[in-house]
């Protein structure tokens, strides 16, 4: 969940960029013995985004995502057509899995689900949960911006906090939200193809629409305690480096195998 929201928070800024915008965020775990936070660096300009975290690089431009593997000097291109094909393939695989599980004796099915852990439980679960997004009235600060805290609860238990900045408090807020809607539509079309397992992604987009702003802090909770946090540490006008939104010379495209 945190990873998904970190990416969404980054993309929400991607149009605030006629002069270029630089963002930096720090992600940390409250549970693990973490020496230092994981840093994400993001550059934005004219609806384009470059996001770096270690050796991982993602570029978003012209309604297309590029994931870049710097050690291997390869990249993968993901456009709407690719998302559609991937969604269809995953949906077929899920339907086959459901059919296989339905034909298993209860004891064998329980054993398989236990072996697969929580992921399999999410795939086979059918019960709806009561999800609520509530404005708390509390405020915090991140990267010099005052934000308002919203709580996300599931069946009355807090799962997440998002501290949100109104679009108007940031450069080109209307363009920011328009880019978010366009990218969100691309992913919503993908998850809508899934017979099961797409609820989490749909809920993430729904939560962000409900708060109607840009998260600069997100915290995940388990059993009432925070376990992970992503916090913006820098938001400033800055021209991106030359070639920031280009595929590096000499990199080889890897096709997704469908």
Feature map (PLM): residue ranges:
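Positively charged n-region of N-terminal signal peptides that target proteins for export
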Residues: 1-4
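N-terminal signal peptide c-region/cleavage motif recognized by signal peptidases
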Residues: 14-16
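Extended soluble regions of mature proteins
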Residues: 19-258
């Amino acid at each position: 969940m945190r990873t998904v929201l970190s990416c969404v928070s980054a993309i929400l800024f991607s149009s605030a960029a006629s002069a270029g915008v630089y963002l930096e965020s720090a992600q940390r775990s409250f549970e693990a013995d973490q020496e230092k936070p994981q840093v994400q660096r993001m550059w934005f300009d004219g609806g384009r985004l470059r996001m770096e975290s270690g050796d991982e690089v993602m570029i978003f431009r012209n309604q297309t995502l590029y994931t870049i593997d710097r050690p291997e000097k390869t990249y993968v291109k993901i456009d709407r057509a690719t998302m559609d094909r991937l969604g269809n393939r995953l949906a077929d695989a899920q339907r086959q899995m459901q059919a296989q599980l339905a034909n298993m004796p209860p004891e064998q099915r329980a054993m398989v689900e236990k072996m697969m852990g929580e992921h399999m439980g999410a795939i086979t679960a059918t019960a709806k949960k009561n999800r609520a997004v509530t404005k708390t009235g509390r405020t915090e600060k991140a990267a010099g911006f005052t934000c308002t805290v919203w709580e996300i609860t599931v069946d009355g238990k807090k799962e997440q906090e998002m501290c949100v900045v109104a679009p108007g408090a940031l450069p080109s807020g209307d363009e920011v939200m328009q880019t978010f809607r366009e990218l969100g539509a691309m992913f919503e079309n993908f998850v809508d193809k899934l017979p099961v397992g797409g609820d989490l992604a749909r809920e993430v987009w729904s939560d962000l629409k409900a708060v109607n702003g840009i998260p600069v802090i997100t915290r995940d909770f388990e059993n009432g305690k925070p376990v992970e946090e992503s916090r913006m540490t820098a938001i400033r006008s800055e021209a991106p480096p030359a070639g920031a939104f280009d595929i590096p010379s000499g990199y080889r495209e890897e096709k997704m195998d469908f």
